Amino acid sequence: MVQGTNHKALTDTDTLGGRISLARDASALSLDNAAKMVGVESDVWSAWENDRSEPGREYLETIAASLQVSGLWLSTGFGLGPRWPGDETLF
């Protein structure tokens, strides 16, 4: 295991819901605020994060833009993922 890496956090990103949750955490948005940005109810957003349902294609790019990640990363886990506060990595 890489020092400082949370294995649970890495395995949680293996699903669309896990990536949505991780990106929201990195964005420091509440579940309610994230849902409002995308135009859905909080229980819908929660279902997405917990893999009880998946957002339709019409929401994926809006979610990605709201959470400042790429649509590719959100869908597949590859590409530009979340940036945490204080992350000074240059792209």
What are the residue ranges of the model-derived segments?
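A short, Lys/Arg-rich alpha-helix, primarily the initiator
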Residues: 1-26
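The DNA-recognition helices of helix-turn-helix-type DNA-binding domains
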Residues: 41, 52, 78-81
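Residue-level signal for the short linker/turn that defines the boundary of a DNA-recognition helix
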Residues: 18, 28-29, 55-58
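Interfacial/linker helices and their anchor residues that mediate assembly or domain coupling
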Residues: 5-6, 12, 80-91
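DNA major-groove recognition helix of helix-turn-helix/homeodomain DNA-binding modules
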Residues: 4, 39, 56-73
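Short alpha-helical DNA-recognition segment
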Residues: 26-50, 66
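Short C-terminal boundary/hinge segments that cap the last helix of small helical domains
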Residues: 68-85
